[in-house]
Amino acid sequence: MRVLAAMSGGVDSAVAAARAVEAGHDVVGVHLALSRMPGTLRTGSRGCCTIEDSRDAWRACDVLGIPYYVWDFSERFKEDVVQDFIDEYAAGRTPNPCMRCNERIKFAALLEKAIALGFDAVCTGHYAKVITDADGNPELHRAADWAKDQSYVLGVLTHEQLKHSMFPLADTPSKAEVRAEAERRGLSVANKPDSHDICFIPDGDTAGWLAEKIEMTTGDIVDEAGTKVGEHPGANAFTVGQRRGLKLGTPAADGKPRFVLEIRPKENKVVVGPEALLAIDEIRGIKVSWAGLPIAEVATGDEFDCHAQVRAHGDPVPATARMERLTDDDGAERTNLVVTLATPLRGVAPGQTVVLYQGSRVLGQATIDTARSLQRAAL
């Protein structure tokens, strides 16, 4: 099988490519140049996609004896990931750029080009598993190492994309084993640190970066009753659940800290309140997609049991979900996902992604439109 190995320059993608070669596939390595911005390309940057990463990817391919190419996807990345990130924050939502990159770059643009060039699959170093059912249909599942599992950020993959995806690290019990294997194979990235920052914000200062991209205007911080309790330098720099950076001139009556409950970009207001008000047990999602073929209840509209996860390394909680068909004022029909949580979650923000699981299987995902407490709504 002809396999295109996406080489990030890290240890995971290097070992994944090595295993693909060892399995007898015809492997070609490619590194994606995703940015021309000096901040992400300079030596010493903490994000990914740096000059050092490109060199590390080349060295790994050289050790493995496979061809190496660099593909420039910087313009598409800027439009589909970076600009989307800016637009979402400007609208008062909290996006996940890694999911957007997987959805539109690594498993859309990259896979499309790979298929056009005659490759059968794209191989990455993600910790996730593709299982083929009895009818030959792919299913996305968690990796053996749940501590490193990345199935959440792959929940955006479609049935067709999963058919052409290869995750050689699926059954690896730990990251330590991956590093040990890299050492045995003579790969120089064996002890390279993991990258945790947003790649286009390498210094980790998201608020500072956004301040350069979005016009920030001073506005009011109000409590849940609408009373002004402070001022902010720009509502777009905040997210639901945040406490740090709030400059409150009026302390809470009970003396307890307050957290961001809501962002109102049109009013340029940040709503704050006690931590207890962050708890939600109903999520309504838009832009719904299914990882593989959807389960039967999706077509019938029946409620189904599942687990819901709202962060890449968050704990999944028991839930029920159903599809809700709505008609807009202009007569257009749309379908939303309604998720009811058995255990309330805190700090869930519009723009985040909810991913649904049954056991280890990823069912699908949706972008969170609203999140609320059914118990408080009933009062």
UniProtKB/Swiss-Prot annotation:
MF GO annotations: ATP binding; tRNA binding; tRNA-uridine 2-sulfurtransferase activity
Chemical reaction(s) catalysed: S-sulfanyl-L-cysteinyl-[protein] + uridine(34) in tRNA + AH2 + ATP = 2-thiouridine(34) in tRNA + L-cysteinyl-[protein] + A + AMP + diphosphate + H(+)
Binding site for ATP: 6-13, 32, 125
Listed SUPFAM superfamilies: Adenine nucleotide alpha hydrolases-like (SSF52402)
Disulphide connectivity of cysteines: 101-199
Cellular compartments annotated: Cytoplasm
InterPro entries noted in UniProt: MnmA-like, MnmA-like_C, MnmA-like_central, MnmA-like_central_sf, Rossmann-like_a/b/a_fold
Classification via Pfam families: tRNA_Me_trans (PF03054), tRNA_Me_trans_C (PF20258), tRNA_Me_trans_M (PF20259)
Biological processes per GO annotation: tRNA wobble position uridine thiolation
Chain positions covered by the region annotation Interaction with tRNA: 148-150
GO CC, alphabetical: cytoplasm
Enzyme class: transferase
Site positions for Interaction with tRNA: 126, 352
Active site: 101 (nucleophile), 199 (cysteine persulfide intermediate)
The entry's keywords: ATP-binding, Cytoplasm, Disulfide bond, Nucleotide-binding, RNA-binding, Transferase, tRNA processing, tRNA-binding
EC code: 2.8.1.13
Protein family per UniProt: Belongs to the MnmA/TRMU family.
HAMAP family associated with the record: tRNA_thiouridyl_MnmA
Task of the protein: Catalyzes the 2-thiolation of uridine at the wobble position (U34) of tRNA, leading to the formation of s(2)U34.
Official protein name in the record: tRNA-specific 2-thiouridylase MnmA
Organism: Arthrobacter sp. (strain FB24)
Gene, per the UniProt record: mnmA
